[in-house]
């Protein structure tokens, strides 16, 4: 008997040794080409880059994987315990592989199989880290062996907290969220510190099936999984029975970001994205580095700018009348027919509907959802002049655009025309708002920075400034009469015209600019010479290489809204050079400032995300460069305030502010502009078709674009006091008769004169009536260049 027992023991020992040898060989065999697990010590996960407004509102997030890295010591205990209870009960007790868990799962799964219950796994958190970082998702015996070997090795090198940190930051939680910090934000709009036990359990439940566990689609299943995690926490002693009951009884309530925490500024964000990618030299680095980018954007102004631009474009488009229905469908199965239609771009708050019935007084409409409503004829009047019956406008089956108004709808259409608006701080160059079009998602073409257009009469300002720089006084008399410019041998003479074809005769230079008189502008140009005008256009950054041609003075050059707005910003700040900038500073994922918009030490950069406005810096005095002299700058500013007080921008006077500005309309009314400024902001706005064509015979900067400026200022600038422009010491104000230009004891306008020529103006009655000029120019105007009706 003993011999038999001894023999059996020898056999068992031999089998054990053979088994150990096999295991040792397997470990040796699969350990030869394992990935380097030590790389996990250098874990820098791809993190989301976020762009903020100056007042701390989130503008945009960019990432290949939306993740915000959070160190383990910042993750609350209850959240860590939720994952340990859900995924790896013995996490702190095993060496990467839970042998007891494997045996337990094997026996439990036999019962689960027989009773058709969900099978349980025994994969530890460490094994999941190995799978997520070092191996593929291949389902094979070989991968499981490698996974177990690596898990053991990692457990010997890394602490449990280091392993848990890797897992909680790398795991995918659905809704594009990687890591617990992003999951907490995405699902509950909270930081991890603010999560309740129930919310922590919900997040811990997601890794099993993140795409399927959507409470909006399968609430019961998601709640059951969350409650399972809660009960595991109770069983493991992490929470009390009362806390578990409260957590189980709580509903799953998802929360989105509050609107006051975010700002919509798609064109602005895209400009920042492009700028920072160029700065970094790598698109991948931008999308993975977890940068915090603080911009100059003013969230409140941005909202008003978008609203004002869209309102202005819609109002202009409606004045052109109703074009036509976007489609016509059969009413036999109209709901399905509506659903089949291609998506209409730029709907925004508008909706698509089909006309079901039409009477003289209204139209009945239906929506793809099956809902019905009506459009009264009062909401169609804009579409056609003297509309007496809705039947004259719409027919059954017409697919149209509508807007909800109280308990009915109004007929609308998507504007064909487009435009842009940009707001800057003229003293710092900060771009406070930038809206590059009607709808970013319909057209990403940025009409602020990319659209080259003719500025029309906006150019006149710089013709007058060139004259002022060269000693011409603002009360100088010029003849607003016919003028003929020789274009050279064999070419017809150039005969520019005023917008309305009339003449005012002898008028002051001030009146010439206020009323935007083309012929006075040409005479000012001939008096000062094209060379000086070309120089000033380059100096102010309007165009880097303008053609030296007389039609240039009426706006035949090309520029962008950003450039021309910046040029007027220089005037607004007293003549100091500025450069538009969107980005204030950039911090890396660790909070270190890696860029700021000037070279000074930043003493206010370490601010919280809710106090970003404190990081805004002013321009250092040592960096100031004068583009024009202070006296000439104030003189042109004074003339431009006259444009608002008495001239083509008179309707803006009702704003009750001290505003300088200039309207602009290019040849054939293809481009319309208005740029207005105060000592604190400069606002540039533009309207035109993307493929240039006339906006209509009566379309001008005054009628089309100025209303956008007024609407914006009425909202965004209403609480600002009417600050005057500072008068430099080199200027003296003198009362002048506005009609004659003569000094009077109590004139109709206070004119600005330079100190060095104030004494020689009292007897200045010369009328400049030059009909030709000997200045040499290097380009001969053509028929295309003959901007004869600029306003």
UniProtKB/Swiss-Prot annotation:
Residue ranges annotated as Periplasmic topological domain: 28-791
One Pfam family linked to the record: PCB_OB
Gene Ontology CC annotation, any one: outer membrane-bounded periplasmic space
Keyword Chloroplast: no
Subcellular location(s) per record: Cell inner membrane
GO molecular function: penicillin binding; peptidoglycan glycosyltransferase activity; serine-type D-Ala-D-Ala carboxypeptidase activity
SUPFAM superfamilies found in the cross-reference section: beta-lactamase/transpeptidase-like, Lysozyme-like
Region (Transpeptidase): 398-711
Membrane topology (Cytoplasmic): 1-6
PANTHER family: BINDING PROTEIN TRANSPEPTIDASE, PUTATIVE-RELATED, PENICILLIN-BINDING PROTEIN 1A
Family, as annotated: In the N-terminal section; belongs to the glycosyltransferase 51 family.
Protein name, entry field: Penicillin-binding protein 1A
Organism, scientific name: Rickettsia bellii (strain RML369-C)
């Amino acid at each position: 008997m003993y011999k038999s027992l001894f023999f059996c023991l020898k056999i068992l020992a031999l089998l054990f040794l053979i088994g150990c040898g096999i295991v040792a060989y397997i470990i040796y065999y699969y350990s030869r080409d394992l990935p380097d697990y030590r790389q996990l010590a250098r874990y820098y996960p791809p993190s989301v880059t976020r762009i903020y407004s100056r007042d701390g509102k989130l503008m945009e997030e960019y990432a290949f994987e939306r993740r915000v890295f959070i160190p383990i010591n910042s993750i609350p205990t209850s959240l860590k315990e939720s994952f340990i209870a859900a995924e790896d009960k013995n996490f702190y007790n095993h060496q990467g592989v839970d042998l007891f868990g494997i045996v337990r799962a094997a026996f439990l799964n036999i019962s689960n199989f027989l009773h058709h219950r969900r099978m349980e796994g025994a994969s530890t958190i460490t094994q999941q880290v190995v799978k997520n970082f070092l191996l593929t998702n291949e389902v094979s015996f070989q991968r499981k062996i490698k996974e177990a070997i690596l898990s053991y090795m990692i457990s010997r090198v890394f602490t449990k907290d280091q392993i848990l940190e890797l897992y909680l930051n790398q795991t995918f939680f659905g809704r594009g969220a990687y890591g617990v910090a992003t999951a907490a934000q995405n699902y509950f709009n909270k930081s991890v510190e603010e999560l309740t036990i129930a919310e922590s359990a919900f997040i811990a439940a997601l890794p099993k099936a993140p795409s399927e566990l959507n409470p909006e689609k399968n609430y019961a299943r998601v709640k059951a999984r969350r409650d399972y995690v809660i009960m595991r926490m109770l069983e493991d002693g992490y929470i009390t029975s009362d806390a578990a009951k409260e957590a189980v009884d709580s509903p799953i309530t998802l929360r989105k970001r509050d609107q006051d925490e975010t700002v919509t500024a798609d064109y602005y964000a895209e400009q920042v994205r492009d700028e920072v990618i160029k700065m970094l030299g790598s698109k991948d680095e931008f999308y993975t580095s977890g940068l915090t980018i603080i911009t100059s954007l003013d969230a409140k102004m941005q909202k008003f700018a978008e609203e004002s631009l869209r309102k202005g474009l819609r109002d202009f488009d409606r004045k052109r009348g109703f074009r036509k229905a976007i489609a016509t469908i059969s009413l036999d199965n109209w709901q399905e027919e509506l659903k089949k239609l291609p998506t209409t771009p730029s709907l925004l708050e508008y909706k698509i509907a089909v006309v079901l019935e039409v009477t003289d007084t209204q139209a009945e409409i239906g929506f793809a959802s099956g809902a019905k409503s009506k459009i009264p004829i009062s909401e169609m009047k804009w579409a056609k002049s003297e509309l007496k019956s809705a039947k004259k406008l719409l027919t059954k089956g017409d697919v149209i655009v509508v807007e909800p108004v109280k308990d009915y709808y109004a007929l609308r259409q998507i504007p064909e025309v487009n435009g842009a608006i940009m707001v800057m701080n003229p003293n710092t160059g900060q771009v406070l708002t930038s809206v590059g079009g009607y709808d970013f998602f319909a057209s990403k073409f940025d009409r602020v920075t990319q659209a080259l257009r003719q500025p029309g009469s906006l150019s006149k300002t710089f013709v007058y400034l060139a004259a002022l720089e060269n000693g011409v006084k603002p009360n100088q008399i010029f003849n607003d009469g016919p003028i003929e410019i020789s274009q050279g041998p064999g070419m017809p003479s150039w005969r520019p015209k005023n917008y309305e074809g009339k003449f005012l005769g002898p008028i002051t230079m001030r009146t010439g600019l206020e009323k935007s008189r083309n012929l006075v502008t040409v005479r000012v140009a001939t008096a000062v010479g094209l060379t000086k005008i070309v120089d000033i256009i380059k100096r102010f950054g309007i165009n880097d290489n303008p053609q030296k041609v007389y039609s240039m003075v009426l706006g035949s050059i090309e520029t962008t809204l950003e450039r021309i707005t910046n040029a007027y910003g220089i005037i607004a700040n007293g003549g100091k050079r500025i450069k538009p900038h969107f980005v204030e500073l950039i911090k890396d994922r660790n909070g270190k400032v890696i860029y700021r918009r000037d070279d000074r030490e930043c003493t206010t950069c370490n601010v919280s995300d809710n106090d970003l406005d404190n990081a805004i810096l002013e321009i250092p005095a040592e960096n100031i460069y004068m583009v024009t002299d202070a006296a000439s700058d104030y003189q042109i500013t004074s003339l431009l305030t006259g444009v608002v007080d008495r001239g083509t921008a008179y309707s803006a006077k009702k704003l009750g502010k001290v505003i300088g500005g200039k309207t602009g309309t290019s040849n054939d009314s293809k481009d319309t502009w208005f740029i207005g400024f105060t000592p604190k902001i400069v606002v540039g706005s533009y309207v035109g078709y993307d493929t240039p064509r006339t906006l209509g015979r009566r379309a001008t900067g005054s009628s089309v674009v100025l209303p956008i400026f007024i609407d914006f200022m009425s909202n965004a600038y209403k609480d600002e006091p009417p600050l005057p422009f500072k008068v430099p010491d080199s200027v003296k104000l003198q009362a002048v008769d506005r009609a004659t230009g003569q000094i009077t004891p109590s004139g109709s306008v206070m004119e600005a004169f330079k100190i060095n020529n104030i004494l020689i103006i009292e007897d200045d009655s010369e009328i400049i009536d030059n009909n030709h000029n000997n200045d040499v120019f290097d380009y001969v105007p053509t028929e295309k260049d003959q901007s004869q009706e600029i306003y």
